[in-house]
C-alpha cells in the first residue's frame, strides 16, 4: 500500500464519526416528519419572520418573546426552505447535527478516546430524538453557539484573540434566547481559577468585547427606529415576569425521566450510569480535587443548566436541552476503562433499540419528502382558505399559525403566539408600551379582517380553559357577514398533531 492510499484511508477514518452522527441525526429526528404539528412554538416563530420580510425589525409589528437574532435565523432558513415546512424541519436537523459534532470534539479533546466520545454524542442525539425535541427550539439554536464558544475556549486557551471569537458566539446565543446569558457565569468563574490576574483580565476583556459588540449594534439599530422600549421589554421586563411565575418543580423533572425510561430504558440507564458513577468517583476524591471539581467549567455548566430549567419556570421539557447536552461532560469523571466500556455498551443497546423501533418509519419519511407536505391537513386547509380570495387579504389567527405560514401572511394581531394572549404579565407590559389596547381581542374582531381563525378552548398549563370569557370564538353567530368553514376533515386527520387534544377545534370564518 503506497503513501497516497494510506493518507486517503486516514482521511476516511476521520470522516467516519461525523458520518455516523449525521446518520443518527437523520434517523432519530425524522420519525414524526409526517406529523405536521408537534409543538406550536415553531409556527409562531415562523410567523414572526414576516416582520423582516416586510422590511421591519423583529417585534416591530409581530411580537414574539425571543431575541432578534433568532428571528433573523428563522427568516434565513425559512427563506431557504421556500415555504416548505418539511425542508425547514430538515434544516433544523443540520443545526442539531453540528451541535452533536461540537460535543464530540469537546469530549475527544478531553478524553482522547473516539469510542467514548462518539457514545456521549450518540446519547445526546438519542435524548433529542424524543417527540418533544423534534422541533426548532431557540434553546437548540443557542446551544449551537454556546457549544461553539466552549469549543473555541477549550481548543485555543492560550490565544486571547480566540476569546474574542468565543465572546461573539456567546453574544449571538444571548440574542437568540435571553436566558442563556446565565452560561457566561461559569465561564467567568472557571477562567478566574485557571489564570493569573493579568491573563484573566486580558481574556475577559477580549471575551467581554466580543459579547458587547453585537448587543451594541442591535441597541443602536433599535434606538434609531424608536423601538428601544419593546427591545428592553422583550429582553428584560417580560423575561423577569416569566421567571417570577414559578411553575417549575423537581417532581416534573422526575416525570421527565420516568417517561424517558418508558420510551427507551437503555437511554434512561445511560443517564443513570453517568450520574451514579460520576457521583461515586467524586465522593472518593481528596479535598483538593473536590475543590478543583467545584470550580471546573464542565461541572458548572451542568449545574447552571439545571438552574436554567428551574428559572424557566414552566416545566417545558425543551428547557432541559442544555442539561441533556452538558450532562455528557460527566464522562470526564470516569476513572477507568471498565466504566467507559459499560457506558458505551449501554448507549449501544439504546441506539439499537431506537433503530429497531424507528428506523423504518424515519427512512420511509425521508424517501417520501416530496409528498409529505401535501398530506399536511393545515397546508390543505390554507389552500381552501386561499381559494376564496382573488387579491390580497388579512388573516387574524388566535391559533393554528401554520396556516399563516403557508399563506405567507403576517398575523393581523401584534401578538403571534396563541398562548401569549392569555399571559397576563405579557399583556400588561405590552399595554403599558401602547402596543395593545384595552379589550384588544374584541377590537381586532370588530375591525372585521377577511379571515378569522380561533379555538373556543385551549389547554393552558395542563388545564382545559374555555376562552369565551375573553372573546366569543363563534364569530358567525354575531357577525352575519362571516361564514364558518367545515373543518372536520382537517381536525380528524392523523397527520395534524402528535399530541391529541380532545378540547381543540379548528374554527375558520371567512368574510363574505
Model features per residue range: what roles?
Residues 371-430, 440-463:
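Short periplasmic/luminal acceptor-recognition loop of GT-C membrane glycosyltransferases, typified by
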Residues 131-141, 316-317:
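Short acidic/glycine- and proline-prone juxtamembrane loop motifs at membrane-interface regions
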Residues 162-178, 184-189, 213, 302-311:
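Membrane-interface alpha helices of multi-pass inner-membrane proteins
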Residues 183-212, 329:
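Perimembrane helix-loop-helix junctions
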Residues 306-342:
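Hydrophobic/aromatic-rich transmembrane helices and adjacent perimembrane loops
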Residues 90-111, 119, 148, 280-281:
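Transmembrane-helix motifs of polytopic, lipid-linked glycan transferases
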Residues 103-126, 143-144, 296:
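Transmembrane-helix signature of polytopic, membrane-embedded enzymes
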Residues 109-111, 147-165, 173, 197-198, ...:
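Membrane-interface transmembrane helices that cradle and orient dolichyl/undecaprenyl
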Amino acid at each position: 500500500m503506497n503513501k497516497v492510499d494510506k493518507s486517503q484511508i486516514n482521511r476516511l477514518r476521520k470522516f467516519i464519526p461525523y458520518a455516523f452522527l449525521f446518520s443518527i441525526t437523520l434517523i432519530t429526528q425524522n420519525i414524526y416528519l409526517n406529523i405536521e404539528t408537534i409543538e406550536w412554538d415553531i409556527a409562531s416563530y415562523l410567523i414572526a419572520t414576516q416582520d423582516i420580510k416586510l422590511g421591519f425589525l423583529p417585534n416591530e409589528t409581530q411580537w414574539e418573546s425571543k431575541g432578534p437574532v433568532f428571528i433573523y435565523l428563522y427568516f434565513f432558513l425559512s427563506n431557504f426552505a421556500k415555504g416548505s415546512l418539511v425542508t425547514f424541519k430538515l434544516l433544523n436537523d443540520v443545526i442539531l447535527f453540528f451541535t452533536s459534532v461540537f460535543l464530540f470534539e469537546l469530549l475527544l479533546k478531553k478524553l482522547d478516546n473516539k469510542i467514548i466520545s462518539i457514545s456521549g454524542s450518540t446519547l445526546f442525539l438519542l435524548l433529542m430524538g424524543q417527540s418533544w425535541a423534534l422541533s426548532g427550539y431557540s434553546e437548540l439554536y443557542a446551544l449551537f453557539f454556546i457549544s461553539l464558544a466552549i469549543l473555541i475556549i477549550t481548543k485555543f486557551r492560550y490565544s486571547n484573540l480566540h476569546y474574542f471569537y468565543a465572546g461573539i458566539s456567546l453574544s449571538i446565543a444571548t440574542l437568540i434566547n435571553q436566558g442563556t446569558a446565565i452560561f457566561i457565569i461559569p465561564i467567568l468563574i472557571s477562567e478566574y481559577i485557571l489564570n493569573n490576574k493579568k491573563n484573566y483580565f486580558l481574556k475577559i476583556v477580549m471575551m467581554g468585547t466580543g459579547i458587547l459588540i453585537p448587543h451594541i449594534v442591535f441597541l443602536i439599530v433599535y434606538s434609531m427606529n424608536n423601538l428601544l422600549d419593546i427591545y428592553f421589554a422583550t429582553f428584560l421586563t417580560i423575561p423577569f415576569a416569566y421567571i417570577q411565575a414559578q411553575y417549575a418543580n423537581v417532581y416534573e423533572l422526575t416525570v421527565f425521566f420516568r417517561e424517558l425510561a418508558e420510551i427507551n430504558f437503555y437511554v434512561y440507564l445511560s443517564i443513570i450510569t453517568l450520574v451514579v458513577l460520576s457521583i461515586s468517583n467524586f465522593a472518593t476524591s481528596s479535598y483538593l480535587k473536590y475543590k478543583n471539581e467545584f470550580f471546573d467549567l464542565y461541572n458548572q455548566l451542568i449545574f447552571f443548566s439545571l438552574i436554567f430549567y428551574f428559572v424557566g419556570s414552566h416545566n417545558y421539557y425543551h428547557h432541559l436541552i442544555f442539561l441533556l447536552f452538558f450532562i455528557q461532560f460527566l464522562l470526564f469523571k470516569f476513572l477507568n476503562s471498565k466504566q467507559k466500556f459499560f457506558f458505551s455498551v449501554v448507549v449501544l443497546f439504546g441506539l439499537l433499540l431506537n433503530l429497531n423501533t424507528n428506523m423504518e418509519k424515519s427512512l420511509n419519511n425521508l424517501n417520501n419528502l416530496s409528498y409529505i407536505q401535501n398530506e399536511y391537513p393545515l397546508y390543505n386547509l390554507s389552500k381552501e382558505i386561499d381559494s376564496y380570495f382573488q387579491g390580497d387579504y388579512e388573516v387574524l389567527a388566535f391559533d393554528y399559525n401554520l396556516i399563516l405560514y403557508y399563506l405567507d401572511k403576517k398575523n393581523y394581531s401584534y401578538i403571534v403566539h396563541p398562548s401569549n394572549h392569555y399571559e397576563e404579565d405579557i399583556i400588561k407590559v405590552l399595554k403599558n408600551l401602547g402596543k395593545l389596547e384595552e379589550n384588544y381581542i374584541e377590537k381586532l374582531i370588530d375591525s372585521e379582517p377577511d379571515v378569522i381563525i380561533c379555538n373556543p378552548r385551549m389547554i393552558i398549563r395542563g388545564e382545559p380553559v374555555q376562552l369565551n370569557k375573553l372573546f366569543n370564538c363563534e364569530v358567525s353567530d354575531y357577525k352575519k357577514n362571516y361564514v364558518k368553514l367545515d373543518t372536520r376533515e382537517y381536525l380528524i386527520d392523523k397527520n395534524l398533531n402528535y399530541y391529541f387534544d380532545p378540547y381543540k377545534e379548528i374554527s375558520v370564518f371567512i368574510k363574505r
